[in-house]
Design a protein with these regions (language model features):
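Two-component system phosphorelay core
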Residues: 1-70, 74-150
Protein backbone atom coordinates (compact mmCIF):
# COMPACT_ATOMS: atom_id res chain seq x y z
CA UNK A 1 0.00 0.00 0.00
CA UNK A 2 2.85 2.41 0.76
CA UNK A 3 4.08 2.34 -2.82
CA UNK A 4 0.52 2.90 -4.04
CA UNK A 5 -0.06 5.78 -1.65
CA UNK A 6 3.20 7.33 -2.73
CA UNK A 7 2.03 7.21 -6.32
CA UNK A 8 -1.31 8.69 -5.39
CA UNK A 9 0.13 11.50 -3.32
CA UNK A 10 3.21 12.49 -5.27
CA UNK A 11 3.54 11.00 -8.72
CA UNK A 12 0.06 10.85 -10.23
CA UNK A 13 -1.74 14.09 -11.01
CA UNK A 14 -5.24 14.20 -9.64
CA UNK A 15 -7.73 14.70 -12.45
CA UNK A 16 -11.50 15.06 -12.47
CA UNK A 17 -13.27 11.78 -13.00
CA UNK A 18 -15.23 11.35 -16.20
CA UNK A 19 -17.76 8.72 -15.29
CA UNK A 20 -21.48 8.38 -15.52
CA UNK A 21 -23.27 10.73 -13.11
CA UNK A 22 -25.80 8.14 -11.86
CA UNK A 23 -25.87 4.36 -12.23
CA UNK A 24 -29.64 3.99 -12.54
CA UNK A 25 -29.49 0.24 -11.86
CA UNK A 26 -27.98 0.88 -8.43
CA UNK A 27 -30.38 3.75 -7.79
CA UNK A 28 -33.37 1.56 -8.71
CA UNK A 29 -32.13 -1.22 -6.42
CA UNK A 30 -31.82 1.26 -3.55
CA UNK A 31 -35.28 2.66 -4.29
CA UNK A 32 -36.72 -0.87 -4.32
CA UNK A 33 -34.95 -1.81 -1.11
CA UNK A 34 -35.98 1.36 0.75
CA UNK A 35 -39.50 1.52 -0.64
CA UNK A 36 -41.42 4.51 0.71
CA UNK A 37 -38.40 5.52 2.82
CA UNK A 38 -36.35 6.36 -0.29
CA UNK A 39 -37.32 10.05 -0.34
CA UNK A 40 -36.62 10.42 3.40
CA UNK A 41 -33.18 8.78 3.05
CA UNK A 42 -32.46 10.98 0.04
CA UNK A 43 -33.22 13.95 2.32
CA UNK A 44 -30.62 12.65 4.77
CA UNK A 45 -28.18 12.41 1.86
CA UNK A 46 -28.87 16.09 1.12
CA UNK A 47 -28.14 17.08 4.73
CA UNK A 48 -25.19 14.78 5.38
CA UNK A 49 -23.70 15.30 1.93
CA UNK A 50 -23.86 19.08 2.28
CA UNK A 51 -22.13 18.74 5.65
CA UNK A 52 -19.44 16.42 4.23
CA UNK A 53 -18.74 18.77 1.31
CA UNK A 54 -18.43 21.71 3.73
CA UNK A 55 -16.01 19.73 5.91
CA UNK A 56 -13.91 18.77 2.88
CA UNK A 57 -13.78 22.41 1.76
CA UNK A 58 -12.80 23.56 5.27
CA UNK A 59 -10.11 20.87 5.45
CA UNK A 60 -8.76 22.02 2.09
CA UNK A 61 -8.58 25.63 3.31
CA UNK A 62 -6.82 24.45 6.48
CA UNK A 63 -4.55 22.09 4.46
CA UNK A 64 -5.68 19.34 6.83
CA UNK A 65 -5.75 15.92 5.14
CA UNK A 66 -6.77 14.18 8.39
CA UNK A 67 -10.05 16.11 8.53
CA UNK A 68 -10.55 15.50 4.82
CA UNK A 69 -10.37 11.69 5.10
CA UNK A 70 -13.46 11.08 7.25
CA UNK A 71 -15.68 13.56 5.42
CA UNK A 72 -14.67 12.14 2.02
CA UNK A 73 -15.21 8.59 3.30
CA UNK A 74 -18.72 9.48 4.51
CA UNK A 75 -19.62 11.20 1.24
CA UNK A 76 -18.26 8.26 -0.75
CA UNK A 77 -20.43 5.74 1.07
CA UNK A 78 -23.59 7.80 0.81
CA UNK A 79 -23.02 8.53 -2.88
CA UNK A 80 -22.51 4.86 -3.67
CA UNK A 81 -25.81 3.78 -2.12
CA UNK A 82 -27.65 6.02 -4.62
CA UNK A 83 -25.47 5.01 -7.57
CA UNK A 84 -23.89 8.47 -7.78
CA UNK A 85 -20.80 7.18 -9.56
CA UNK A 86 -19.03 10.43 -10.40
CA UNK A 87 -19.49 11.79 -6.88
CA UNK A 88 -18.43 8.46 -5.37
CA UNK A 89 -15.31 8.31 -7.55
CA UNK A 90 -14.33 11.87 -6.76
CA UNK A 91 -14.82 11.31 -3.01
CA UNK A 92 -12.74 8.12 -3.33
CA UNK A 93 -9.84 10.01 -4.96
CA UNK A 94 -10.06 12.73 -2.31
CA UNK A 95 -10.11 10.18 0.52
CA UNK A 96 -7.26 8.03 -0.79
CA UNK A 97 -5.08 11.00 -1.70
CA UNK A 98 -5.70 12.60 1.69
CA UNK A 99 -4.84 9.29 3.42
CA UNK A 100 -1.57 9.14 1.48
CA UNK A 101 -0.83 12.73 2.43
CA UNK A 102 -1.40 11.88 6.11
CA UNK A 103 1.05 8.97 5.85
CA UNK A 104 3.66 11.18 4.19
CA UNK A 105 3.02 14.24 6.38
CA UNK A 106 2.15 16.18 3.26
CA UNK A 107 -0.54 18.75 2.48
CA UNK A 108 -3.40 17.91 0.08
CA UNK A 109 -2.64 20.78 -2.30
CA UNK A 110 -3.02 18.57 -5.38
CA UNK A 111 -6.70 18.07 -4.47
CA UNK A 112 -7.59 21.73 -4.84
CA UNK A 113 -9.20 21.42 -8.27
CA UNK A 114 -11.32 18.42 -7.23
CA UNK A 115 -12.41 20.08 -4.00
CA UNK A 116 -13.32 23.31 -5.79
CA UNK A 117 -15.63 21.36 -8.14
CA UNK A 118 -17.07 19.07 -5.47
CA UNK A 119 -19.98 21.24 -4.30
CA UNK A 120 -21.33 21.81 -7.82
CA UNK A 121 -20.96 18.09 -8.57
CA UNK A 122 -22.83 17.23 -5.37
CA UNK A 123 -25.60 19.74 -6.15
CA UNK A 124 -25.95 18.48 -9.74
CA UNK A 125 -26.10 14.87 -8.54
CA UNK A 126 -28.64 15.69 -5.85
CA UNK A 127 -30.84 17.64 -8.28
CA UNK A 128 -30.95 14.69 -10.68
CA UNK A 129 -31.73 12.23 -7.87
CA UNK A 130 -34.43 14.47 -6.37
CA UNK A 131 -36.02 15.08 -9.76
CA UNK A 132 -36.14 11.36 -10.38
CA UNK A 133 -37.58 10.75 -6.90
CA UNK A 134 -40.34 13.33 -7.30
CA UNK A 135 -43.75 11.63 -7.57
CA UNK A 136 -44.85 14.33 -10.02
CA UNK A 137 -41.97 13.54 -12.37
CA UNK A 138 -42.48 9.79 -12.12
CA UNK A 139 -46.22 10.01 -12.81
CA UNK A 140 -45.98 12.25 -15.89
CA UNK A 141 -46.48 10.33 -19.12
CA UNK A 142 -46.53 11.84 -22.59
CA UNK A 143 -49.89 11.57 -24.32
CA UNK A 144 -48.38 11.53 -27.81
CA UNK A 145 -46.51 13.69 -30.29
CA UNK A 146 -47.29 17.37 -29.85
CA UNK A 147 -49.55 16.78 -26.86
CA UNK A 148 -49.17 17.93 -23.31
CA UNK A 149 -48.06 15.69 -20.50
CA UNK A 150 -50.83 14.10 -18.44
Amino acid sequence: WNSVSSLICRERPVEPLESELIDWTVCAATRSSLGPNFVRILGYFREDGTDSVSKIEAAMRAKDPVAMVMAAHTLKGEALQFGALRLWGTAEVIEMTARACVEHHDTPDELLELVVGLRSMFEETLAVLEEDASPVVRERHPLGFGRQFG
